[in-house]
């Protein structure tokens, strides 16, 4: 891979927030930190729009705008960045949600310099994860992102913030070990040491080594997505994190897990994926049903939304496991859609807490009269989350279903079982979301909740944040190509690569595709 442009545009996207963060301590007044952070976030987002609008070719499935500079040549470590259809939409999603999170944190008064410093560090690291093409650089950016999140929860979180932050860092740090194990297995597992993803994808590995690396990456990315039973850090983190951090946590950080699965497990370890894909499909179905059932039992608003996120990420797993272009399309669309929907719901949840000082569902109620704008936008976000036709959630889930049903890699009974379990989750989703709306906004207001003088509807700044998230949700729902055109050609190429790893004659079994050699051993049928 060689430098394809004279100006290192992708390096600018990563380094701008990372380096600009160190300018915050130099500001003469703390109140300037929010303006500074907003300027950096908006500039980076504008730079993304310019780069992808003028220098990116939507018709090309290969890596574009590639940059490669020797960093530590003694160990083959390069500053290697590139973008394709897998990373393009997620980079934009990261830029949009993080910039809006800065606006959402506008009234922060406790240590604003440190808060926005950490937020910009996290921003740059997220973009770096999506653009990195060197496994060691990918790992480095992944690790840089962990520390700001830990501190942002531990310092600005709720009463149990230390517990939630510690649980987050223990889970994610342990997961990082598996990224390192998988990376080293691939780097040393074939002739010629390399950390470059493109070079690793072109090499041939023993199947046993592929399975080892795949399992390691699956555990690491399964924690981040998260996948049941590696999910238990997420409800605690969401419960204690402030609203702006929950926006980024649900909107961007979870997508890093899905991106890692597609980029490494599917894109490079496609032969091992043949064996693990049925497991992913089952885990996806379990995620959907478990997340929906757990959400039903939550009395705390943010915990209900956290378990909802777990359920929605199950569709990503099923899409990845489908072996079809539609499945991969649906997985990416579900990540984009959920990122926007979760961000707006957690933002509006934070607004509700600011007004009422509680998120206990049995203590809320009757807020629709005092907060009609918040009620309308919260309802719109909830309807998008339950996959109402005309909104992005519907398109994402429908595409995943079609990808699974049209797959010829599984027996019809297996596909029907997965689809049935997913359908159970879809039926439960409106139950826990609509009951949540009823408990928060309908009924009689608890007289001990808060004085009416403290209740106020959305202000213009808050309306702007919510609408900037809801409009893309509606736009993608009505015209999905707004999102799918960014990755269509890439998913076609990845799906073709996956199908080349399947047996020449696909023999359908309830769980695993059967290798051609096993066909001869089967008794003849009448």
Curated annotation (Swiss-Prot):
GO biological process: ATP synthesis coupled electron transport; electron transport coupled proton transport
EC number per UniProt: 7.1.1.-
One term under GO cellular component: plasma membrane-derived thylakoid membrane
Record field: transmembrane: 7-27, 35-55, 86-106, 114-134, 135-155, 168-188, 208-228, 242-262, 276-296, 310-330, 331-351, 374-396, 417-437, 463-483
UniProtKB keywords: Membrane, NAD, NADP, Plastoquinone, Quinone, Thylakoid, Translocase, Transmembrane, Transmembrane helix
Alphabetized InterPro entries for the sequence: NADH_Q_OxRdtase_chain4 (IPR022997), NADH_Q_OxRdtase_chainM/4 (IPR010227), NADH_UbQ_OxRdtase (IPR003918), ND/Mrp_TM (IPR001750)
Family: Belongs to the complex I subunit 4 family.
Name the record gives this protein: NAD(P)H-quinone oxidoreductase chain 4 1
Organism whose genome encodes this protein: Synechococcus sp. (strain JA-3-3Ab)
